[in-house]
């Protein structure tokens, strides 16, 4: 399945069912609170990501909390959104060490998430944030 190949490519860690259920519930809550077409579409893509990641992780009995139309609609937004984020963090990682593969898809515009990622990969937080902010200015699709 194409989605499983994509998840393998991103190489995100697999977690237990409880972790994925919590993640999916949090994304559903954010979707319910979203206002405006683009924000709703973006949050829908986050739900699709959480769901497909859980399925990829082996949790096959998890129920899709969206209609098929919503799923497909979210999928169309999810693939480029998360792939671009992943490529963004890979590029930042390579700026520290050509062998450093940062596998992250979090929103790089949220400073606290940048700090978490820097800690996870044992990188200087301030340098990581500065490089991220500088690169964000050139990556218009992440704005």
How does the language model describe each region?
Residues 1-143:
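Flexible "arm" and connector segments at domain edges
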């Amino acid at each position: 399945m194409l989605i499983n190949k994509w998840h393998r490519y991103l190489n995100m860690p697999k977690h237990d069912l409880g972790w994925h259920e919590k993640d999916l519930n949090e994304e559903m809550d954010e979707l319910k609170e979203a206002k405006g077409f683009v924000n709703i579409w973006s949050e829908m893509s986050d739900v699709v990501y959480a769901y497909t990641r859980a399925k990829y992780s082996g949790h096959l009995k998890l129920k899709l909390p969206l209609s098929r139309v919503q799923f497909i609609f979210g999928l169309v937004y999810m693939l480029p959104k998360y792939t671009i984020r992943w490529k963004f963090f890979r590029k930042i990682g390579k700026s520290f060490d050509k062998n450093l593969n940062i596998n992250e898809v979090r929103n790089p515009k949220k400073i606290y998430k940048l700090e978490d990622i820097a800690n996870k990969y044992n990188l200087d937080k301030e340098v990581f944030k500065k490089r991220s902010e500088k690169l964000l200015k050139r990556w218009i699709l992440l704005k």
